[in-house]
Each structure stands twice: as structure tokens, then as C-alpha cells.
């Protein structure tokens, strides 16, 4: 929840930051980009160190650290009177976002019973989307506080951050991590509280056996061996198009975009709430459809819809006076993203790489995804200043169209296959749709 909330709460503060820090000039456009994208740059650092720290200190300890960082970041950003301090606070928040977004799913997967592991990990992703939506509602209701409302928008995050920290105090450590440290009695106690005594004994035997048969570690350079190049090309490609088509830039600047379309400030915030609700609703739809229709149909339909929606937004800005069309097309764009590139990318990345390469590959591709996201968010204000909203959304639309061609050509269908079956099927370059 905090990951989604912290990432998008900045959208409400943008109109006020432009005034408070004097960011309306051409040079200010790039500074505004830094203010908004700083969380993304911090998240990259959090991504990079999360795995090492969670292996060394434990999953729970890292999550507690992220709670402290969330709290410190929100209060420092809310009280900042200097632009540099504000940037530092947002980078601090990014560290917590980057660490939490990788550590939380690992913790859930390691402590949850096998029968409910998939649904619980999915709920984690759903909570991020809900956090995004709640941030839009929070911003709307705090808007009436006047010129300092941006401070309240950023500072209110301290409440769920403090609650998050408090609840983590009552959460046990990951039993798998405890076993890696030889703390068998503690691991048994945790598993018994979650799964019962009999299941706990069996689970400890399975985990211990997996340590004995643990696959060799894969070096970074080995990921780029010839046999993995097509899979890596697809991984880097889908990660690029997920962010290069503008999703985070749109979320982070959403009220500003609606304002540029001609809406009043309060109306722009209200429209952002509607977009957030659509995002949540369509994420539920994606969870329901992904194992029924498959990955490729969702990707093809969703990315095509994104391209059409973005090009429609570009036209509406060019023609001017079409605020309602901008709203409808943005809702369509977010809905299409929420059933395609949003959830499907991470599902495919967790499926297509062989087990001994999976963790390293997802880490590398995830870092690339964060880099593209931060870059697109940084450049958005400067692009709007140089090209106008119409030109900016035209560029996003053309990239989405290119993404449709790329994904249609290379995306495999993995529905209904075990990971072991997929390893065999994807061991060589496959034609589009070969995996059924």
C-alpha cells in the first residue's frame, strides 16, 4: 500500500511545488522533473541493495527499515523549505519503495502456505494499486487546506507508515531465512503458528532438502550467453515498453495533465480519483482473466488499446477544448494498462527464465525497468514545455504502437504450463505463440 501511495501522492503536490520552489520557467521544468522522479532514482538504489540486505539481516528487518524510511521521508518532505532537502527526502522514500517492492513478495512467498501463496502475493500487488488510488482521494480532500496543502499531502503518509512499523513488530521473521541461519527452533515455531505442527515438520524437511540441492549461482555475465539472448531481449523489451509508454509520468502528473486540458484544479483532482478507481477495478479483472484467457491476448488487446488511447489524447490536446475526451481516453489508457503491461509483465518475467537464472534475470530487468521509469518521469515536464501535451502523448502513442508489434512478435503464451515445462519449451528461441 505504501509503495503505491508514496509513488503517486506527489501528483497532488506538483501544482504547489511549481509555485513554492519557482519551477515555472524553462529551467524549472527540468527541476520539477527531478522533484517528481527523485523517488524513482532512489528506488533503483533500493532495488540494488534489497536482496543483499534481506539475505544478511532478514526479511522482517529490511521491512522494518523501510517503514522507518517511509516515515522519515514523508515528514522531511512535508517540512522541507529547501529544494535540495525536498529532493533528498524523496530519494529516501525511493530507497524504501525499491527495497519494499522486492522484499515484501519474497517474505509473503516464504511464510505463506502453498495453497494460498499465489493469492497472497497477488494481494500484495493489488495493495500497491489501491495505494495509488487512495493517494488521489487523499490529495483531493486535502486540497482545500490552501497553499500549504502540499505539505499535508506528503505528510499524511506518516500515519500509515507509523501503523506499518507498529504492525511489523508483531510479524515473525521468514522461516526460510531463519533456517538459512541455522535457527531451526525459531523457524519451527513460526511455521507451526502458520501451518500447524505436522505441516511445519514436513515443510522444514523440504526447505532443508532444497538447501542441499540448491542450484549454483549464476554470474551476471552468464545471463548474456547466447542461449538466453532472446529471453533477455523480450524481458528488456517488455520492461522498456511498460514504462516508455508513460504510465508513471501520467500517474505522477495526472492533475497537472487534466489542468492542461482546461479543467479547474479541484475538477482535475476529482478526475484523478476516478482514474484511480478504474485502475483498481481493472486490476481485479486482470487477476481474474490472466489464467483464463492467457498472457498474449491480454497483452495484445491491452497494448493496442493503450496506443489508440494515447493517440486520441494527443489529438484532443491538438484540437483543444476537448477536456472530456482527454478524461475518457486517459481512463481507457489506464484500464488497458491495468489488464496488460501492468500485471502481465511481472507474471511473464517470473515464468520465462530457467530457475537458476530467474532471480538474477528479474533483478537485472527490474533495474532496467526502474531506470526507464525514472527517466521518463524526469523528462515529462521538459517534453511538455518543448513539444506541448499533444506532442508528448503522440510520442507515447507511437511507442505503444511499436510495443504492440514487438510484443505480438515475441511474447510467449505460458498459461497452464508448469515452470519445468516452460524451461524445456523456452530453451531455444521460439516463434510467437509457439508456447500454447
Language-model segment annotations:
Residues 200-211:
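Short, well-structured alpha-helical segments
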Residues 1-186, 190-192, 212-436:
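Alpha-helical transmembrane bundle of multi-pass membrane proteins
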Amino acid at each position: 500500500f505504501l509503495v503505491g501511495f508514496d509513488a503517486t501522492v506527489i501528483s497532488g503536490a506538483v501544482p504547489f511545488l511549481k509555485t513554492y520552489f519557482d519551477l515555472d520557467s524553462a529551467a524549472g521544468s527540468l527541476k520539477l522533473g527531478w522533484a517528481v522522479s527523485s523517488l524513482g532514482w532512489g528506488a533503483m538504489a533500493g532495488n540494488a541493495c534489497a536482496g543483499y540486505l534481506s539475505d544478511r539481516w532478514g526479511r522482517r528487518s529490511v521491512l522494518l527499515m523501510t517503514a522507518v524510511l517511509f516515515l522519515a521521508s514523508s515528514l522531511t518532505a512535508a517540512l522541507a523549505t529547501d529544494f535540495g532537502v525536498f529532493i533528498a527526502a524523496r530519494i529516501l522514500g525511493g530507497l524504501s519503495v525499491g527495497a519494499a517492492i522486492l522484499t515484501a513478495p519474497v517474505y509473503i512467498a516464504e511464510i505463506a502456505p502453498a495453497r494460498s501463496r499465489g493469492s497472497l502475493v497477488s494481494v500484495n500487488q493489488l495493495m500497491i494499486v489501491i495505494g495509488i488510488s487512495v493517494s488521489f482521494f487523499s490529495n483531493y480532500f486535502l486540497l482545500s487546506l490552501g497553499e500549504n496543502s502540499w505539505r499535508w499531502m506528503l505528510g499524511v503518509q506518516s500515519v500509515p507508515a507509523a501503523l506499518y512499523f507498529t504492525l511489523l513488530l508483531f510479524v515473525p521473521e521468514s522461516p526460510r531465512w531463519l533456517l538459512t541461519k541455522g535457527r531451526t527452533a525459531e523457524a519451527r515455531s513460526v511455521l507451526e503458528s502458520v501451518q500447524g505442527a505436522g505441516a511445519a515438520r514436513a515443510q522444514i524437511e523440504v526447505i532443508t532438502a532444497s538447501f542441499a540441492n540448491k542450484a549454483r549461482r549464476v554470474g551476471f555475465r552468464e545471463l548474456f550467453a547466447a542461449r538466453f539472448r532472446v529471453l533477455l531481449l523480450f524481458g528488456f523489451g517488455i520492461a522498456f515498453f511498460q514504462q516508455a509508454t508513460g504510465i508513471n509520468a501520467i500517474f505522477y502528473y495526472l492533475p497537472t495533465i487534466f489542468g492542461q486540458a482546461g479543467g479547474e484544479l479541484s475538477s482535475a483532482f476529482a478526475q484523478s480519483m476516478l482514474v484511480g478507481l478504474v485502475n483498481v477495478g481493472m486490476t481485479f479483472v486482470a487477476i481474474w482473466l490472466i489464467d483464463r484467457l492467457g498472457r498474449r491476448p491480454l497483452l495484445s488487446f491491452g497494448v493496442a488499446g493503450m496506443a489508440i488511447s494515447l493517440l486520441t489524447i494527443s489529438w484532443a490536446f491538438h484540437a483543444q477544448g476537448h477536456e472530456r475526451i482527454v478524461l475518457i481516453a486517459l481512463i481507457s489508457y489506464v484500464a488497458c494498462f491495468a489488464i496488460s503491461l501492468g500485471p502481465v509483465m511481472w507474471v511473464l518475467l517470473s515464468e520465462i527464465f530457467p530457475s537458476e537464472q530467474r532471480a538474477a534475470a528479474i533483478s537485472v530487468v527490474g533495474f532496467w525497468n526502474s531506470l526507464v521509469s525514472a527517466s521518463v518521469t524526469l523528462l515529462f515536464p521538459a517534453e511538455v514545455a518543448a513539444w506541448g501535451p499533444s506532442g508528448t502523448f503522440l510520442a507515447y502513442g507511437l511507442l505503444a504502437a511499436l510495443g504492440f508489434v514487438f510484443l505480438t512478435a515475441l511474447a510467449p503464451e505460458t498459461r497452464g504450463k508448469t515452470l519445468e515445462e516452460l524451461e524445456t519449451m523456452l530453451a531455444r528461441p521460439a516463434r510467437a505463440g509457439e508456447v500454447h
